[in-house]
Structure formats: structure tokens, C-alpha cells
Curated annotation (Swiss-Prot):
Domain F-box: 398-444
Keyword terms of this UniProt record: DNA-binding, Leucine-rich repeat, Metal-binding, Repeat, Ubl conjugation, Ubl conjugation pathway, Zinc, Zinc-finger
Post-translational modification comment from the UniProt entry: Acetylated by CREBBP; leading to ubiquitination and subsequent proteasomal degradation.
ZnF region ranges: PHD-type: 65-131
Task of the protein: Substrate-recognition component of the SCF (SKP1-CUL1-F-box protein)-type E3 ubiquitin ligase complex that plays a role in different processes including cell migration, cell proliferation or cytoskeletal reorganization. Mediates RHOA ubiquitination and degradation in a ERK2-dependent manner. Induces RAC1 and RAC3 degradation by the proteasome system and thereby regulates TGFB1-induced E-cadherin down-regulation and cell migration. Also mediates ubiquitination and degradation of IL-33-induced receptor IL1RL1 and subsequently blocks IL-33-mediated apoptosis.
Organism: Mus musculus (Mouse)
Quaternary structure (record): Directly interacts with SKP1 and CUL1. Interacts with RNF20.
Protein name (Swiss-Prot/TrEMBL): F-box/LRR-repeat protein 19
Binding site for Zn(2+): 68, 71, 94, 97, 102, 105, 125, 128
GO molecular function annotations of the record: unmethylated CpG binding; zinc ion binding
Length: 674
């Protein structure tokens, strides 16, 4: 029964969370790995969105939303005291089928489960163990990390096998001396081949019941014990789920044998003592080779298949997985190694080793063979060809060139508006390329458009305008960030009426040439948002020693209709010292203390302010009017719609304004001729 038929969500993996207790979780970023270099705090672009390599949790836990697949409840191990009861009520995740269940909810009599001792709440559930399903690679699964010396660290700690049956009889004792030259096959039987099972006296067993028919026991897995097969040729041997490699396991069992006898497999020689293995017919051999080839072809394209499917195929194929295996080698139980290195031999399915000539055939399951990798194709970066330079002359239909050069045509195009330029771009390809010149597009107006399409954004970038009006548009943060990163020469930007969600893109886009910024009537702007906009960027690139704010070079700032307080004005005076025009109209929190901050002796705007708009600020009174005499360069002061300001006080200020008198074309509007 497959995992897909066990209920909805049976095979869905739960993303584990940090334990927040291990050494990797409590440390800080290293700042040197490629993930740290990508982070914005270390000067990177921030595209990978990954944490530091040294901060990867070594014991991730299940999320708090994980529940049992059978009863639908969370883990309740904290409500009991005994170890067995805690284990029965805790949630366990299977590494094969990814099911999360309580061990007590599984109603299985004769079954075993292998607990992973490194990762919490992780095991191989009894259902998968009973069906004979294993992981794709038993040596590289979760919790089986290799140590620095090349050995598997999980083998030192070991796992536990849980069962309800009595333990089997003890295994054969380890031999101390050299093996006899000619033992009978009943002493240490080799692995039963598929053809031998079909042609022998024993009835064939189902493929998935090979591992499920083992005798279960409760045994600590670990140490250097090498378990061979029992005396009963029908029962497969019990092996620990993790071994170091074939050479180490064999040397620990038989220390008296020289390495040259067991490192390289040799073909067995038929002896008179042992019975001969019956050879299959040529038709059956062709059928077996065809089945193996079909299995290999099915595995090559399906690299992302589930572990249960690949393991069942590996178990059913036995020891005959090689496509180019000779018939004689298949009958004698020998399979050529896939590679010369010990790692490839360790990752193989079953490995047959003959210690000496005429010796017994020893075999142990080292895990199923992984599916072969698909052929890797060469990858090349395909870049578009460079654009050819623009022609200096206009080719005519007759084959000659127009007498006017490109510079003369551009001077003619400068007298045309945007609509006429778009018409000229449709005349010919040469005019279309000439009309993209940025001198023809000093200002582009896209205001009051509900949405901006990608062709519109691409057209703006190709024209490189100096002033861009995006007021009252539905531009998104991603679109605005894409635009600003490609308009480094932008001097004027109008974003009035947009949402702060999109305007917040200004915090991550460099605008070195910006001189005018219009942020009037932006929704949901508080002191915290304005502080984020005014403060220097936290991701200063390496080599930049000065911490300049984003608005250091801005000369005109329009903040009408925002909820600004005196704290925001202090930040404004500190991080925007070059302002000559400031619009604070209709700001409800601006009053007499705000005017005192703007005109204080320590204020940098006292000497640079030329235009000041305070229209609609209802908290201003007549007491703040004498403070404006501190600004010697003030040429325009707009106090219209200020309810608490009297016209007589404004007239007295206009008559005695420094260094000369103001004129009042309208009530509460003070102008001075330069």
C-alpha cells in the first residue's frame, strides 16, 4: 500500500523549525559565507533570502502546528511521567513516508520502528519497516551526517529497534583464525538470487516481504559487532541500519585475513565440495536482462520520485542491477563494481566479497543502490548581442542618405511634444532609435493611471527622463524599485497620492542625483515611516565611510498632508540640510514650536530656506510670525487658511520683513521680489 492511499496529506512533509538551543541557533552570522555576503546587512543584494551556513540548526523540531495524522491531536508527552508513556504520546515523523503520528495510535502487532537518535521526533515508522520500504540512500538520510574523519557520526550513537517479539538466538561467534579453504555452502550461505529462488526447492517469497519477514527484537544498534547470517538459510540476517563501509566491517569480523584478499572481488571457482548452481536457460536470461534494462530506463528520467518507490525497485532487483553484467557473473553471484573508489562501493546495493580462493561467499545488505543520475548537459550563459551604434544619417529609399545629419534632426525633434514624438517613432527604424534620446524626454508624466504595464516601465527606462511624475498611480513597490535602480540620473520624483507600501521602495534605492521629492498626501505615513526614509541606509556598501542620509542632496521637499510631529522635523533638519523649499501645508501637528525648530540658531534651514508653505496649519498663532525674520533668504511665505492667524499680524510682518518689505498679492501670502 502506497503512502498516497493513507489519507489526505499523508505524504506531505512538514517544514521543521529551529530548536533555538543548539550551538548553531544561538550564534551570530559569520559574514563570510555566500549566504551572508548576499544579505543586505553585509552589503549584498538580498536575493537568496537564506540564513547563514553556520546557523543551520542541527536538531530541527516539528512545528507547533503539527498534529497526529490518525487522531488529529498534538503531542501530549508533557502530561505523563513514564518514558514509555511519553514516547507513546509524542509525535514522530517518518523519514520515509513523512507521516506524523503518535506511536500509541498505530495499531500494529508485529512490527518494528527505527528511531533516529540525532534528530528529535524522527523515526522509520513500523508500517514502512513492515512493508520493507527504506530511504533512497541509507547513508545520507536525515540524521546520518558524516563526521569530519569520514566515518558516520550516527553510527557511534546508534539507533533503537522497537518490537514486541522475543529476541532471536545469538548470532554466530566471530572467527579469530583464517577461514577454512573449502566450506560447504550451508555454513555461511550467500544472498538468495532471484533465479535461485525460482529454480530452488523453496517457494518464492513476495518481494516486499523480504524485510518484513525478519524477526523483530529490541536491540541497541552500534559498536563493532559484525552480524552474519544465521544457520537457517531461509531467514535473512539481521544487520544494523548503519555500517561504516564494507572494508571496515569485514576487517572487524576477520582480522586475520590480508587486505588484498577482500578488497577486490574475485570470481568464485566451482569446487567439488559445494553443489553447482543451476544455470538458467538463454530465454530466461534474456528476459531478466530486459527487465533490468526497463527498470533502469524508468529510473533515469524520474529523479524526483518518492523514496518508497525507488526503494521497492532496489529491493526487487536484488544484486543484479548492472546493465552490462555477463551471464556467467550473474550465475556465480558476482557483480562488477560501479567505480573504483570505496565510496561508490559503499553506496551500492549488496556487495559480495570472497576472502580467498574457494572461501565462503559473504554478503550483507548495505542499503539499496541509488538511482543513476541523469546525464548532465553543458550549461552556457546566452547573452544578447550588443546593440549596433545609431546611424548618423537617415537612409532613403533610393539608397542615398539624407543631407541632414542626426544632430540636426534631434534639434528639430526637441520642438515636438510627447505625442508628436511617438508619431515620428512610427515612421522608420532610424527615427525610432533617434527619438529615444534622453534629451527629448526631460520629463515624463504617468500620473493618474490605475496600473503601469511592463512595456510602460521599459519605455521609461529607455528614455531616461530627468523628471518623473507617478502621482496618484497604482505603482507597486516592486515596480518602483525596478524603476529607481535604473534611473540613476533622476532629479525630480513625484509620488503624491501613492501608498506608503509602494513609496517605501525609496528606502532601498540609491538616488544620488535627486533634487526634488514630492510625497504629498501619502497614506499611512507616521514618524516611524519618515524616520526609515530619512535615516542613512543600514546596508552601507564596503568602502563607504560616511553615513549620509538618503535626502542629503534634496533641495525641495513636499510633505503636505502628512502627520508630521516635532520629532520628524528634528530628523528632517539633521538629514536634509540642503533644503531651500519646504512644503508643510495641511500638516495638523505643525504649530508654533515647529516654527521655532525651523528658525532656531542651530537649524541649517535658517540660512538656506527660500520657500516655505505652511498653508492650512491651524495650530499657528500670531506669536510665531516674528520668528520668520530670522530667515534672511526667505522669498515666499504661504500662511493662507491658517485660522488663528490674523490678517493684521501678517500685514505687520510684511511691512517689517528683513531685509526688505514683503508684498501681499493675496491675504496671508507674503512674497518678496528677488
Amino acid at each position: 500500500m502506497s503512502s498516497s492511499s493513507r489519507g489526505p496529506g499523508a505524504g506531505a512533509r512538514r517544514r521543521r523549525t529551529r530548536c533555538r538551543r543548539c550551538r548553531a541557533c544561538v550564534r551570530t552570522e559569520c559574514g563570510d559565507c555566500h549566504f551572508c555576503r548576499d544579505m543586505k546587512k553585509f552589503g549584498g543584494p538580498g536575493r537568496m533570502k537564506q540564513s547563514c551556513l553556520l546557523r543551520q540548526c542541527t536538531a530541527p523540531v516539528l512545528p507547533h502546528t503539527a498534529v497526529c495524522l490518525l487522531c488529529g491531536e498534538a503531542g501530549k508527552e508533557d502530561t505523563v511521567e513514564g518514558e514509555d508513556e511519553k514516547f507513546s504520546l509524542s509525535l514522530m515523523e517518518c523519514t520515509i513516508c513523512n507521516e506524523i503520528v503518535h506511536p500509541g495510535c498505530l495499531k500494529m502487532g508485529k512490527a518494528e520502528g527505527v528511531i533516529n537518535s540525532e534528530i528529535p521526533n524522527c523515526w522509520e515508522c513500523p508500517r514502512c519497516t513492515q512493508e520493507g520500504r527504506t530511504s533512497k540512500d541509507a547513508g545520507e538520510g536525515p540524521g546520518r551526517r558524516r563526521a569530519d574523519n569520514g566515518e558516520e557520526g550516527a553510527n557511534l550513537g546508534g539507533g533503537w529497534k522497537l518490537t514486541e517479539e522475543p529476541p532471536p538466538p545469538p548470532p554466530l561467534p566471530r572467527r579469530k583464525g583464517p577461514l577454512p579453504a573449502g566450506p560447504t555452502p550451508d555454513d555461511v550461505p550467500g544472498p538468495p538470487k532471484r533465479k535461485e529462488r525460482e529454480g530452488g526447492n523453496e517457494p518464492p517469497t513476495p518481494r516486499k516481504k523480504v524485510k518484513g519477514g525478519r524477526e523483530r527484537h529490541l536491540k541497541k544498534v552500534g559498536g563493532d559487532a559484525c552480524l552474519l547470517r544465521g544457520a537457517d538459510p531461509g531467514s535473512p540476517g539481521l544487520l544494523p541500519p548503519r555500517v561504516l563501509n564494507p572494508s571496515q566491517a569485514f576487517s572487524s569480523c576477520h582480522p586475520g585475513l590480508p587486505p588484498e584478499n577482500w578488497e577486490k572481488p574475485k570470481p568464485p571457482i566451482a569446487s567439488a565440495e559445494g553443489p553447482a548452481v543451476p544455470s538458467p536457460s538463454p530465454q530466461r536470461e534474456k528476459l531478466e536482462r530486459f527487465k533490468r534494462m526497463c527498470q533502469l530506463l524508468e529510473r533515469v528520467p524520474d529523479t524526483s520520485s518518492s523514496s518508497s518507490d525507488s526503494d521497492s525497485d532496489s529491493d526487487s532487483s536484488g544484486t543484479s542491477l548492472s546493465e552490462d553484467e555477463a551471464p556467467g557473473e550473474a550465475r556465480n553471484g558476482r557483480r562488477p563494481a560501479r567505480g573504483s573508489s570505496g565510496e561508490k562501493e559503499n553506496r551500492g546495493g549488496r556487495r559480495a566479497i570472497r576472502p580467498g580462493t574457494g572461501g565462503p561467499l559473504l554478503s550483507w545488505p548495505l542499503g539499496p543502490a541509488p538511482p543513476p543520475r541523469p546525464p548532465q548537459l553543458e550549461r552556457h550563459v546566452v547573452r544578447p548581442p550588443p546593440r549596433s551604434p545609431e546611424p548618423d544619417t537617415l537612409p532613403l529609399a533610393a539608397g542615398s542618405d539624407h543631407p541632414l545629419p542626426r544632430a540636426a534632426w534631434l534639434r528639430v525633434f526637441q520642438h515636438l511634444g510627447p505625442r508628436e514624438l511617438c508619431v515620428c517613432m512610427r515612421v522608420c527604424r532610424t527615427w525610432s532609435r533617434w527619438c529615444y534620446d534622453k534629451r527629448l524626454w526631460p520629463r515624463m508624466d504617468l500620473s493618474r493611471r490605475k496600473s503601469l504595464t511592463p512595456p510602460m516601465l521599459s519605455g521609461v527606462v529607455r528614455r531616461q527622463p530627468r523628471a518623473l511624475d507617478l502621482s496618484w498611480t497604482g505603482v507597486s513597490k516592486k515596480q518602483l524599485m525596478w524603476l529607481l535602480n535604473r534611473l540613476q540620473g533622476l532629479q525630480e520624483l513625484v509620488l503624491s497620492g501613492c501608498s506608503w507600501l509602494s513609496v517605501s521602495a525609496l528606502g532601498s534605492a540609491p538616488l544620488p542625483a535627486l533634487r526634488l521629492l514630492d510625497l504629498r498626501w501619502i497614506e499611512d505615513v507616521k514618524d516611524s515611516q519618515l524616520r526609515e526614509l530619512l535615516l542613512p541606509p543600514p546596508d552601507t556598501k564596503p568602502g563607504q565611510t560616511e553615513s549620509r542620509g538618503r535626502l542629503q542632496g534634496v533641495a525641495e521637499l513636499r510633505l503636505a498632508g502628512l502627520e508630521l510631529t516635532d520629532a520628524s522635523l528634528r530628523l528632517l533638519l539633521r538629514h536634509a540640510p540642503q533644503l531651500s523649499a519646504l512644503d508643510l501645508s495641511h500638516c495638523a501637528h505643525v504649530g508654533d514650536p515647529s516654527v521655532h525648530l525651523l528658525t532656531a540658531p542651530t537649524s541649517p534651514l535658517r540660512e538656506t530656506l527660500v520657500h516655505l508653505n505652511l498653508a492650512g496649519c491651524h495650530r499657528l498663532t500670531d506669536h510665531c510670525l516674528p520668528l520668520f525674520r530670522r530667515c534672511p533668504r526667505l522669498r515666499r511665505l504661504d500662511l493662507r487658511s491658517c485660522r488663528q492667524l490674523s490678517p493684521e499680524a501678517c500685514a505687520r510682518l510684511a511691512a517689517a520683513g528683513p531685509p526688505g518689505p514683503f508684498r501681499c498679492p493675496e491675504e496671508k501670502l507674503l512674497l518678496k521680489d528677488s
